């Protein structure tokens, strides 16, 4: 029997160690039995604003059997969660990943998910339930189209200070948040890194390490003028004799001008193209320029480092809690893990495998929709259109006014409801 190369054996053992060390804390593809793992909250049921979830692949997909959960009612609150074995990311990388598709061409609503800690009554999970991490896209109007990354530290929710744009089309996208033991993070969309940095700089979790010295003052001899007047520059001879305005040589006395009645005619004046305003010497670089003065940075006496700044010690639930004006957001392939490579692989095996087919299905659905809209549009002859225009000419302004008033009222109502919901988040 041939002996195996010791180096080959070492490589196999190393690969096995890597595989074993990678841990999947929670993974949900919403296959059979998903309802036993997820608890629908009773939040907002009493005031009849709780939305229903639908188990579906959506109106277009790359695989009709690959289903997720989708919001199904407009102007509703949604809350659902699943429990997993309590997990701490101390000394580990934390990976939080999921996919979401906004089939409704979302104009105001969330597409984010949450990780929660400690014990939570899942039947009461809602907007007021404390969470550890909130991550994912949020869209509202033209101003809000970003990826939320909110971390809870010492009972306070802290928003990321960097703007991370989210996807706004009607296709599936994968959102990934990676948090490492060195307090660095990455945000990926569709397996492409969109933002990376440090918890210290990109969130206000702790006071700043360094601050400007409040007792420092700019030295009296500090010259911060970058340019100065040229001391060798002199005013040209006769410069002050150039008038600001001159008579218009093209002007002519009107034919009906009467000197006796109107007085002596004088040509109007026009701006003098040779006049350059008050003379000032030209500017030159200041040889004594020291730059803009800045107070020196000193250690912040308020800063106290926390080596476990990145740690969430009792993660136990994953959930969706959001408000939607228009329903149709579909969540799928939820993952909590300590292995970024596994997360990338899962994204490619799900979203990556089906994205082209999904795009083709979407394009076909759009084509059919446009054809149906074209069929529904009334076809009228030119004569009929002219007759109708004559009949309705007198009513156009009234109808237009009523239509505008109705539209204005609807928009005002929608804006008020949207603002109220966002205030609640």
Curated annotation (Swiss-Prot):
PROSITE patterns: CALRETICULIN_1, CALRETICULIN_2, CALRETICULIN_REPEAT, ER_TARGET. Residues 263-301 are annotated as: 3 X approximate repeats. A motif (Prevents secretion from ER) lies at residues 422-425. Residues 213-281, 348-425 are annotated as: Disordered. GO terms for cellular component: endoplasmic reticulum; endoplasmic reticulum lumen; mitochondrion; nucleus; plant-type vacuole; plasmodesma; secretory vesicle. Residues 1-22 form the signal peptide. The keyword Secreted does not apply. SUPFAM superfamilies: Concanavalin A-like lectins/glucanases (SSF49899), P-domain of calnexin/calreticulin (SSF63887). One of its GO terms (biological process) is protein folding. Disulfide bonds join 108-140. An alpha-D-glucoside binds at residues 112, 114, 131, 138, 321. Keywords: Calcium, Chaperone, Disulfide bond, Endoplasmic reticulum, Glycoprotein, Lectin, Metal-binding, Phosphoprotein, Repeat, Signal, Zinc. Induction: Induced by cadmium. Sequence repeats lie at residues 194-205, 213-224, 230-241, 248-259, 263-273, 277-287, 291-301. Residues 213-235, 241-255, 348-378, 399-412 have a biased composition (Basic and acidic residues). Residues 194-259 are annotated as: 4 X approximate repeats. The modification Phosphoserine is found at residues 381, 397. It holds the Pfam family Calreticulin. Molecular calcium-binding chaperone promoting folding, oligomeric assembly and quality control in the ER via the calreticulin/calnexin cycle. This lectin may interact transiently with almost all of the monoglucosylated glycoproteins that are synthesized in the ER. Belongs to the calreticulin family. Can be divided into a N-terminal globular domain, a proline-rich P-domain forming an elongated arm-like structure and a C-terminal acidic domain. The P-domain binds one molecule of calcium with high affinity, whereas the acidic C-domain binds multiple calcium ions with low affinity. This is Calreticulin-1. The gene is CRT1.
